[in-house]
Amino acid sequence: MSKKLTFQEIILTLQQFWNDQGCMLMQAYDNEKGAGTMSPYTFLRAIGPEPWNAAYVEPSRRPADGRYGENPNRLYQHHQFQVVMKPSPSNIQELYLESLEKLGINPLEHDIRFVEDNWENPSTGSAGLGWEVWLDGMEITQFTYFQQVGGLATGPVTAEVTYGLERLASYIQEVDSVYDIEWADGVKYGEIFIQPEYEHSKYSFEISDQEILLENFDKFEKEAGRALEEGLVHPAYDYVLKCSHTFNLLDARGAVSVTERAGYIARIRNLARVVAKTFVAERKRLGYPLLDEETRVKLLAEDAE
């Protein structure tokens, strides 16, 4: 590889590439979440009959993975570049390999493997066929064809490509520690993020008030239910995300037992399923506006029978 791209140049390159493939460039969703999949731009849009092609960077928080900024590869918060395409293009894997070439990674010169790794997210009732993508022995991407989201079968099938930006940047820049990644010319990743990593880790493992978090979970769950009673999908889903992050904080603090853990996950999943069903009903009521006219009329006629 000749020029070593900065972290932000990697993002810009991927944005331009997937824009050229017809993806809308969305912005990171403004609620804490553990993965880009949990953004409404993936979770909600992967269900129902309407097409959807989007790409976006998603900061992803995983409190239990915090290491006070001392581990070169484990982070409280990392960044994913998320691509969702529905229906899935038949050449999605070829497009992905082409995107690596744009980053200066020639597939013919490197060991790139698709390793089967079917995906499941119990807290949202989602699952799919999947592969990890390994570049010279390091996982850099997760590929998933969604089969179920929010407890609902998907159709048409949505393809999801999730790049781990820190891992990709570490490889491209040939650095061993994420904190040595060059974010922009002259600015290191650690100069931006190592202090937040330390503080969030300290809060998650030492400072957070378990009683307040438990109360918050109950309140967020209740508010999600109230929003759903009024058919308000998006406010309800915001509270599902808040429940999920609050649970992750409780889990990091060691505040939930194995039995309680399953119960909390089930509570989040039940809410996510109702959100998914309500969203599909809402899109139908709106007349599936993203469908082409012929398909829309046909589908609405079939639904009316």
Swiss-Prot record:
An annotated GO BP: glycyl-tRNA aminoacylation
EC number(s) on file: 6.1.1.14
Enzyme class, first EC level, given as a word: ligase
Entry superkingdom: Bacteria
Compartments reported by the entry: Cytoplasm
Keywords: Aminoacyl-tRNA synthetase, ATP-binding, Cytoplasm, Ligase, Nucleotide-binding, Protein biosynthesis
Gene Ontology cellular component terms for the protein in this record: cytosol
Keyword field contains Protein biosynthesis: yes
Matches recorded under Pfam families: tRNA-synt_2e (PF02091)
InterPro entries: aa-tRNA-synth_II/BPL/LPL, Gly-tRNA-synth_heterodimer, Gly-tRNA_ligase_asu
Molecular-function GO term, any one: transferase activity
Catalytic activity: tRNA(Gly) + glycine + ATP = glycyl-tRNA(Gly) + AMP + diphosphate
Family: Belongs to the class-II aminoacyl-tRNA synthetase family.
Description of how the protein assembles with itself and partners: Tetramer of two alpha and two beta subunits.
PANTHER family named in the record: GLYCINE--TRNA LIGASE, CHLOROPLASTIC_MITOCHONDRIAL 2, GLYCYL-TRNA SYNTHETASE
Protein name from the UniProt record: Glycine--tRNA ligase alpha subunit
Organism: Streptococcus pneumoniae (strain P1031)
Lineage: Bacteria, Bacillati, Bacillota, Bacilli, Lactobacillales
